[in-house]
From Swiss-Prot:
Protein's recorded name: Ent-kaurenoic acid oxidase 1
GO CC term (a single one): endoplasmic reticulum membrane
GO molecular function: ent-kaurenoic acid monooxygenase activity; heme binding; iron ion binding
Superkingdom of origin: Eukaryota
Cofactor(s) essential for the protein: heme
PANTHER family per the UniProt record, alphabetical: CYTOCHROME P450 26 (PTHR24286), ENT-KAURENOIC ACID OXIDASE 2 (PTHR24286:SF356)
UniProt lineage: Eukaryota, Viridiplantae, Streptophyta, Embryophyta, Tracheophyta
Designated gene of the protein: KAO1
Membrane association type: Single-pass membrane protein
Homology family: Belongs to the cytochrome P450 family.
Length: 499
């Protein structure tokens, strides 16, 4: 046998050794987490792969999302193990069951006895231990009851609508009048606009400097939300946790100032009541008021939910409308009809006008499905539970893969096509449309978010055009889907503009 042949044999043996070592390490890691279940219960687990110790499936997860093919992660499990609906993995340093079908997601989300919130350590630390993401059922119900009406109630939305409408009109006009070549980062500026709106709603008295500081700090915090909780220089979580400390300090200063003024402005007049004032004053049935750390964590949570999703979905909806002339024309015709129905003397939009936006609502829903801002959420089993015939052991984490549901061709035919008409007819069955979750932990700011998005699209459709500088720009999927150039574009005011 020649020297070349020996080298070939050695290479094959080495490759086989690597494969054997990989299989042995994976098997040992799986045994470590499942041995205590016993043979009977272990045999009822969903199929899957626990990966290597410490990292588990995180490398494959990050590789899929950072390569621009986010669906390939769950697709790899489906190819290897079939369409089981549940898969076993090791994610975010925990043994995890991943739910990927409407039926599995619905059962987990609707069972508050068997499942509690189970977000990763990084998310809990950054949003806050006293926020919804870390609360038990009773405390969550109490806080949701205290905060829901001031966010999504009819009176609340009515009071917010005027400011949202004025802000959108002023912002669009300003963008269309920019100097130079007119290009700017559309997503970045949208996020600033939605942040101004949410700060006004929650902290109406915050000055411009404080609002700008909050926006910069929050942006740093957000990039660590889906990272592993490694608090070392160079890691996203390390930078984010430091931003969290600065954000808490800034909110505490505003809170201290509010308490000191006792509902008065600096000049001594009665101050308008905003969400922070309501959180300071609100009492539950037992007469208990919220502590400062509870108020701050609630504010951070709503800054995240109300600002991040609105900015990104508004950008993508605008892009999809501009890329689909027939859809744009239909949405524009609806908004023109609404304008013609507004009585003389009415200033701005009303909730009555908003509720006439049937087709625009379909556009927003299709954008929510297509983009998947919240691609996954987290629960933890409080006891052994069987879902789809598989065991979810007590203490294990559960990931609810909303993205897999929304991009499943068995649920949505041709899922990679942007098609608002799929929302015509009866509402989707429970578990198939999950942009805001489901059950008692449905996102409390969903109506406010849709109101913001719809008001922006209303004015954009009636008077403006978006032209992207890099229309084929690559998309980055973590922490949220966005073009790598933040949608560098210019806004042009049309001659037929109504504003």
């Amino acid at each position: 046998m020649g020297e070349g042949a020996w080298w070939a044999v050695a290479a094959v043996v080495a490759a086989l050794a690597v494969v054997a070592l990989d299989a042995a390490v994976r098997a040992a890691h799986a045994w470590y987490w499942t041995a205590s279940l016993g043979a009977g219960r272990r045999g009822r687990l969903p199929p899957g792969d626990m990966g290597w110790p410490l990292v588990g499936g995180m490398w494959a997860f990050l590789r899929a999302f950072k390569s621009g093919r986010p669906d390939s992660f769950i697709d790899s499990f489906a190819r290897r193990f079939g369409r089981a609906g549940l898969y076993r993995a090791f994610m975010f340093s925990s043994p995890t069951i991943m739910a990927t079908t409407p039926e599995a997601c619905k059962q987990v989300l609707m069972d508050d006895d068997a499942f509690v919130t189970g977000w990763p350590k990084a998310t809990v630390a950054l949003i806050g231990p006293k926020s919804f993401v870390n609360m038990g059922y009773d405390e969550h119900r109490r806080l949701r009851k205290l905060t829901a009406a001031p966010i999504n109630g009819f009176d609340a939305l009515t009071s917010y609508l005027g400011f949202i409408d004025d802000t959108v009109v002023t912002t669009l006009r300003g963008w269309s009048e920019r100097g130079g070549d007119g290009h700017f980062e559309f997503l970045t500026e949208l996020r600033r606009m939605t942040f101004r709106i949410i700060v006004q709603i929650f902290m109406g008295g915050a000055d411009e400097r404080t609002a700008a500081e909050l926006e910069r700090t929050y942006t740093e915090l957000n990039y660590g939300m889906r990272a592993m909780a490694i608090d070392l220089p160079g890691f996203a979580y390390h930078k984010a946790i430091r931003a969290r400390r600065r954000l808490v300090a800034a909110l505490q200063r505003v809170l201290d100032e509010r308490r000191a003024r006792g509902g008065k402005t600096a000049a001594g007049a009665a101050a308008p009541v905003d969400m922070m004032d309501r959180l300071i004053a609100v009492e539950d049935e037992g007469g208990r008021r919220l502590q400062d750390d509870e108020i701050i964590d609630v504010l951070v949570m709503y800054l995240n939910a109300g600002h991040e999703s609105s900015g990104h979905i508004t950008m993508w909806a605008t892009v999809f409308l501009q890329e689909n002339p027939e859809i744009l024309a239909k949405a524009k015709a609806e908004q023109e009809a609404i304008m013609r129905s507004i009585p003389p003397g009415q200033k701005g939009l009303t909730l009555r006008d908003f509720r006439k936006m049937a087709y625009l609502s379909q556009v927003v829903d299709e954008t929510l499905r297509f983009v998947n801002i919240s691609f996954v959420s987290f629960r933890q089993a409080t006891r052994d539970v069987f879902v789809n015939g598989y065991l979810i052991p007590k203490g294990w984490k559960v990931q609810l893969w909303y993205r897999s549901v929304h991009m499943d061709p068995q649920v949505y035919p041709d899922p990679k096509k942007f098609d608002p008409s799929r929302w015509e007819g009866p509402p989707p069955r429970a578990g198939t449309f999950l942009p805001f979750g489901l059950g008692t932990r449905l996102c409390p700011g969903n109506d406010l978010a849709k109101l913001e998005i719809s008001v922006f699209l209303h004015h954009f459709l009636l008077g403006y055009k978006l032209t992207r500088k890099n229309p084929n720009c690559r998309v980055r999927y973590l922490p949220h889907p966005r073009p790598v150039d933040n949608c560098l574009a210019k806004i042009t005011r049309l001659s037929s503009s109504h504003g």
